[in-house]
């Protein structure tokens, strides 16, 4: 037997003395209660839950501090029984009462071993108990008097009268508009020295409480025209106290996600300079004015958290916002009590059948007279009364409506034959539609129409290239090489993007797609890449036609003509913004000629667009490059399609839990039109080899220099075009040897010489054959 020394025995005795005794808790018998004796609480549900169909659910109630046990009967059925459970508060008090005698007992044991140690432990325990009690009574503001809290709050949120005045001599053009001094300091920091025409007229009206309908050319600063009155109002209000959710004051509705995010960025950029400290640093704490976005394609949970935190301004697309409103009664109440409602690109937003959610959102802001319903006296319906139904729309809400076009004539489909308006009176205008759908508080809204003649800005020059449908790719490739710069190519379908994108990528052009089928993150990434590349090419549908303010877009190419004139105006408005020069090119095939004439007539043009000069000497080499790239694209498309069809067949068979005939996958069936057709191995090998050969051929063609007619590479000082000076000074064209470096803007005149509808010089006119 091992001996235990004195030191070890002493340690064991100390451990046994200090070991706390475990409290013995007696198990109480369960107390079952009936459903009638419980305290049921009604659950507040959304007022819009019935819109999507609630499955007949009219009302919900909930219970607290009740457990459920399931008892199985002889027949196998389960019956729920309610068990009374102690609430958390009572349970906490009992635990505290049980801990006190344990602490006293532990103190007695320690006293037997060491009296001094016990006294120190007792003091520490008493001190901790006092601190815990204080924390329970004052969780947030312990040790502060109410007067001190109010004083601290006033220091954190200073009085607005202490805002330093702005010296109008620094910005004399803005002196006539009485905006908040912080906004004018932001203008000075951003070198925004003078308002545009639409801003100088819309901002004073918005500040004085008027409803504004503004029509102005693209790139004229409409975003600031409606944003500045809102920010002026918000900066004039007291800051919301810490811990209190700030109310929603303004809602900006946009047709596309990209436009909504762009508007939010513009507002934040303006506020960044307006709210900066004198040192130019960002102020500490929550922002004075909070701006958030609610758009589709991004995390809905994150947007819900932003809304729950509270925002002064929300920029949203109607679809996602309405989805959140249907699930959140508090958000619906915030929209009903708005101070500002803004509809950007209004002509697009109010088109019939396009934005059904917009009408539902607008109805929330409409004033309606209270009517007694047949079920209002029913106690069940009274219990269902929600926060939204108890709220009322504001009488002082301001409505701002802005767009580049507000004309019904510009919204007609040009491919359809124009029909005479057979209704009584004149055809309703877009402004009349706005008055019907929007509840303007102003009896006579301020209508500002600054739309330019011809629909486009004066700094934009337009031209066209008439070609066959098959040669459009050739002339597009020529234009992008001949006039390098940031260009947007508009097409009418996503299929056109999917065809052009791999083609231009094979030709080593920096091209990026943008269409509605892309995920939102990918769309934003492509936009950022396009903005950062001075020679970037964006192939887009009309999703990029409205509102996007991309700096320094040199060219807009209408690969397919738009279906409406207002779409043409908005497409062309992506260039020539803020009085900068811009160029728009139309690629017109014979079957689009009638649409092009109708387009020009709807824009009240009297002359044809001038033709863009083409240097035909480059076309044969470009055509050969394009031919090889097209063959590669078709071969790759066939291989991708075959793999896709096979994968689809396997997934469908697995989903239906059926077996596939091996012949369908082994390629025994030689029908190339069948979805399960699989070429033989030797054919696949030949296909891969041919694609590799084509890629090598294209690589060699791309390395060859493109030389204009009359230029000699061996003898640069001879020939009809002397290029020796350009080679020495490096002033020639980077891609096309012998081509000039002039811009497309300088290659055409402002208007064409031929009248609209007149034949081309030298064209053979068809004679009408009259019947006998």
From Swiss-Prot:
It comes from the Eukaryota. It catalyses: ATP + H2O = ADP + phosphate + H(+). GO terms for cellular component: nucleolus. GO terms for biological process: rRNA processing. It comes from Cryptococcus neoformans var. neoformans serotype D (strain B-3501A). A motif (Q motif) lies at residues 172-200. Belongs to the DEAD box helicase family. DDX24/MAK5 subfamily. GO terms for molecular function: ATP binding; ATP hydrolysis activity; RNA binding; RNA helicase activity. The gene is MAK5. Its EC number is 3.6.4.13. It is an enzyme of class 3 (hydrolase). Residues 203-424 form the Helicase ATP-binding domain. InterPro entries: DEAD/DEAH_box_helicase_dom (IPR011545), Helicase_ATP-bd (IPR014001), Helicase_C-like (IPR001650), P-loop_NTPase (IPR027417), RNA-helicase_DEAD-box_CS (IPR000629). ATP binds at residues 216-223. This is ATP-dependent RNA helicase MAK5. Keywords: ATP-binding, Helicase, Hydrolase, Nucleotide-binding, Nucleus, Ribosome biogenesis, RNA-binding, rRNA processing. Its main location: nucleus. The keyword Hydrolase applies.
């Amino acid at each position: 037997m091992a001996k235990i020394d004195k030191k070890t025995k002493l340690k064991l005795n100390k451990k046994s003395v200090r070991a706390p005794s475990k409290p013995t808790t007696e198990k109480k018998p369960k107390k079952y209660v009936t459903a009638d004796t419980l305290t049921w609480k009604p659950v507040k549900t959304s007022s819009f839950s019935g819109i999507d169909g609630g499955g007949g659910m009219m009302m919900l109630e909930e219970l607290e501090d009740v457990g459920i046990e399931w008892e199985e009967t002889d027949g196998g059925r389960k019956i729920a029984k309610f068990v009374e459970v102690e609430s958390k508060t009572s349970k906490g008090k009992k635990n505290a009462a049980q801990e006190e005698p344990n602490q006293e007992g532990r103190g007695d044991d320690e006293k037997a071993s060491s009296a001094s140690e016990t006294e120190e432990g007792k003091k520490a325990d008493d001190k901790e108990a006092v601190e815990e009690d204080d924390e329970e009574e004052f969780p947030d503001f312990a040790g502060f008097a109410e007067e001190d809290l109010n004083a601290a709050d006033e220091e954190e949120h200073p009085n607005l009268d202490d805002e330093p005045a702005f010296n109008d001599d620094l910005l004399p053009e803005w002196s006539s508009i009485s905006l908040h001094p912080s906004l004018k300091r932001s203008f000075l920091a951003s070198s925004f020295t003078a308002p545009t025409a639409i801003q100088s007229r819309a901002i004073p009206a918005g500040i004085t409480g008027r409803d504004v309908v503004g029509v102005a050319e693209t790139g004229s600063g409409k975003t600031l025209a409606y944003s500045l009155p809102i920010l002026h109002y918000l900066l004039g209000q007291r800051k919301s106290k810490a811990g209190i959710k700030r109310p929603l004051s303004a809602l900006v509705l946009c047709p596309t996600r990209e436009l909504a995010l762009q508007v939010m960025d513009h507002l934040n950029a303006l506020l960044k300079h307006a709210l900066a400290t004198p040192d130019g640093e960002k102020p500490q704490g929550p922002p004075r004015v909070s701006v958030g976005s609610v758009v589709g394609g991004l995390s809905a949970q994150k947007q819900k958290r932003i809304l729950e935190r509270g925002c002064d301004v929300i920029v949203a697309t109607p679809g996602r916002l309405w989805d959140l409103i249907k699930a959140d009664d508090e958000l619906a109440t915030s929209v009903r009590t708005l101070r500002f409602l803004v509809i950007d690109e209004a002509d697009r937003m109010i088109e019939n059948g396009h934005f059904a959610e917009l009408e539902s959102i607008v109805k929330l802001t409409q004033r309606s007279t209270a009517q007694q319903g047949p079920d209002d006296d029913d106690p069940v319906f009274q219990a269902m009364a929600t926060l939204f139904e108890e709220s009322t729309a504001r009488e002082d809400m301001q409505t701002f409506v802005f767009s580049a076009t507000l004309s019904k004539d510009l919204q007609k489909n040009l491919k359809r034959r124009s029909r005479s308006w057979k209704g009584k009176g004149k055809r309703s205008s877009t402004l009349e539609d706005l008055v019907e759908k929007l509840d303007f508080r102003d009896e006579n809204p301020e209508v500002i129409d600054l739309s330019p003649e011809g629909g486009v800005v004066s700094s934009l020059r337009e031209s066209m290239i008439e070609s066959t449908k098959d040669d459009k790719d050739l002339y597009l490739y020529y234009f992008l090489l001949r006039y390098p710069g940031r260009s947007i190519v508009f097409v009418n379908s996503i299929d056109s993007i999917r065809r052009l994108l791999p083609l231009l990528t094979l030709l080593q052009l920096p091209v990026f797609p943008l269409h509605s089928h892309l995920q939102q993150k990918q769309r934003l990434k492509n936009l950022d890449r396009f903005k950062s590349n001075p020679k970037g090419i964006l192939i887009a549908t009309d999703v990029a036609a409205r509102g996007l303010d991309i700096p320094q877009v040199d060219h807009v190419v209408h690969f397919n003509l738009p279906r409406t004139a207002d779409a043409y105006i908005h497409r062309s408005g992506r260039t020539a913004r803020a009085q900068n020069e811009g160029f728009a090119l139309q690629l017109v095939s014979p079957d689009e000629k009638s649409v092009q004439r109708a387009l020009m007539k709807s824009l009240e043009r009297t002359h044809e667009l001038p033709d863009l000069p083409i240097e035909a000497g480059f076309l044969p080499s470009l055509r050969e490059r394009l031919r090889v790239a097209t063959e590669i694209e078709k071969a790759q498309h066939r291989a991708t399609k075959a793999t896709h069809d096979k994968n689809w067949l396997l997934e469908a068979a697995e989903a239906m839990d059926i077996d596939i005939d091996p012949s369908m996958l082994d390629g025994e069936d030689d029908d190339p039109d069948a979805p399960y057709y699989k070429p033989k191995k030797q054919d696949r090998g030949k296909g891969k080899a041919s694609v590799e050969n084509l890629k090598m051929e294209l690589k060699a063609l791309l390395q060859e220099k493109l030389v204009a007619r009359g230029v000699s590479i061996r003898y640069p000082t001879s020939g009809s075009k002397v290029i020796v000076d350009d080679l020495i000074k490096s002033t020639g064209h980077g891609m096309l040897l012998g081509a000039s470096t002039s811009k497309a803007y300088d290659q055409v005149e402002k208007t064409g010489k031929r009248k609209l509808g007149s034949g081309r010089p030298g064209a053979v006119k068809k004679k009408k054959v009259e019947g006998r």
